[in-house]
């Protein structure tokens, strides 16, 4: 059964995560910061890592852009959870496809492993990421030949909805894609819980 926790900003929804998954102490996480490595603003990477560690989780970092397929395979398979940070979604997708990590992640999720997707990590679960090019630059993924993504859900998660500095951009995307694809906007204080075919959006009050 599919277990996905999708968010815009993990550090801002930690109570929602512990509601979604309570058995955390001593569990291990493969932490993938790859999307952030081509960005200038990266504070959310350390913030996400610290939030995980504060819950008693053991974090093992994996940059899929620089590791061998053997190392990627080992880390994805041995740890209990998979966490993919924010950053540039197109670069992330390019590296997932180039290394074959996309298929490995799908295999692990199909086997029941919990996937935590933050911002770009949530966007790549969509069928196709073309909708996010208003927010993310495609120029950081010159070798990406198409925008077909992990296709784990039948909607397109739009992170940071109505949050600074993305307020205008996110509203523009919602307007632009109205009727074309199912855009699922979430703010920094919301998360999407997915268990099997059940999809629930929750918000911190």
UniProtKB/Swiss-Prot annotation:
The keyword Cell cycle does not apply. It is an enzyme of class 3 (hydrolase). Keywords: Hydrolase, Protease, Serine protease. The active site is at residues 119, 160. GO terms for biological process: proteolysis. InterPro entries: Class_I_gatase-like, Peptidase_S51. PANTHER family: ALPHA-ASPARTYL DIPEPTIDASE, PROTEASE S51 ALPHA-ASPARTYL DIPEPTIDASE. Belongs to the peptidase S51 family. This is Uncharacterized peptidase Lmo0363.
